[in-house]
Amino acid sequence: MEPGNYTVVTEFILLGLTDDITVSVILFVMFLIVYSVTLMGNLNIIVLIRTSPQLHTPMYLFLSHLAFLDIGYSSSVTPIMLRGFLRKGTFIPVAGCVAQLCIVVAFGTSESFLLASMAYDRYVAICSPLLYSTQMSSTVCILLVGTSYLGGWVNAWIFTGCSLNLSFCGPNKINHFFCDYSPLLKLSCSHDFSFEVIPAISSGSIIVVTVFIIALSYVYILVSILKMRSTEGRQKAFSTCTSHLTAVTLFFGTITFIYVMPQSSYSTDQNKVVSVFYTVVIPMLNPLIYSFRNKEVKEAMKKLIAKTHWWS
């Protein structure tokens, strides 16, 4: 492209989910409620785990960090999406767009590593219960949590580095409700295929590794459960894994669709729907999944409510 034949883009316009005013109002109210439930649910999980001695175990340490990541994940996307419902087109500078992408990828990738760590925790608890206190010591737990965050930011910097090297010299309207990498790539006038391949390889590798760890952990867990003679023991083991398996299926099913499958295999509208699910809906569902199906969490909640009521 000849110099001077294009205008350098300095800001983008997020088109959002819909142009219809009535639909926008309905979606604004709906997602405001979803975001409020997300914040309250995840904050409640964090406070509950921090204030309940019976929940001071590795599993609930991971769960508290999962709640923190869900708050960050949702908060990096939902507020700007809500603003988009109130005004036609949301303006965002290029630097702000790249920053949002970086934060979204960091929180999302950290969550995948954390879910793998939680699967390993369940494997040790069920398959080697006598060694649990040594194999899941505080040092090991801190290392697993720290590695999850580190892995998230490394992947985020890969996406950030590629996006900073993209050139934007034409349309600046992003047909999305946040700055995701795929819509940015479609607007770019750069023709370097590596900018599409490198993030896909990075995300794909992380998904393969984390899913492999989760799958291998649950294969061993299943074998151990089938060897149990006690029906009550089997039910208890299954119940501790059901919530995590549900969260894993929802999370990895959606991010695989977006970050691994070729862009030509899905439309922009499909991208939007799936993106809403994994950035807005799943962070709301996780605390509900872990609360309703977990006796220890429900008991800790009852004690906290009773204590609060007594002090009042």
From Swiss-Prot:
Disulfide bonds join 97-189. The keyword Membrane applies. It is found in: Cell membrane. Glycans are attached at residues 5, 165. GO terms for biological process: G protein-coupled receptor signaling pathway; sensory perception of smell. GO terms for molecular function: G protein-coupled receptor activity; olfactory receptor activity. It is a multi-pass membrane protein. The chain crosses the membrane at residues 26-46, 55-75, 100-120, 134-154, 197-217, 238-258, 272-292. Keywords: Cell membrane, Disulfide bond, G-protein coupled receptor, Glycoprotein, Membrane, Olfaction, Receptor, Sensory transduction, Transducer, Transmembrane, Transmembrane helix. Gene3D superfamilies: Rhodopsin 7-helix transmembrane proteins (1.20.1070.10). Residues 1-25, 76-99, 155-196, 259-271 are extracellular. Signal peptide: none annotated. GO terms for cellular component: membrane; plasma membrane. Residues 47-54, 121-133, 218-237, 293-312 are cytoplasmic. The keyword Nucleus does not apply. Belongs to the G-protein coupled receptor 1 family. Probable odorant receptor, which recognizes only aliphatic alcohols, suggesting that it may convey a 'woody' or 'sweet' sour. This is Olfactory receptor 5p57. It comes from Mus musculus. The lineage of its organism: Eukaryota, Metazoa, Chordata, Craniata, Vertebrata. The gene is Or5p57.
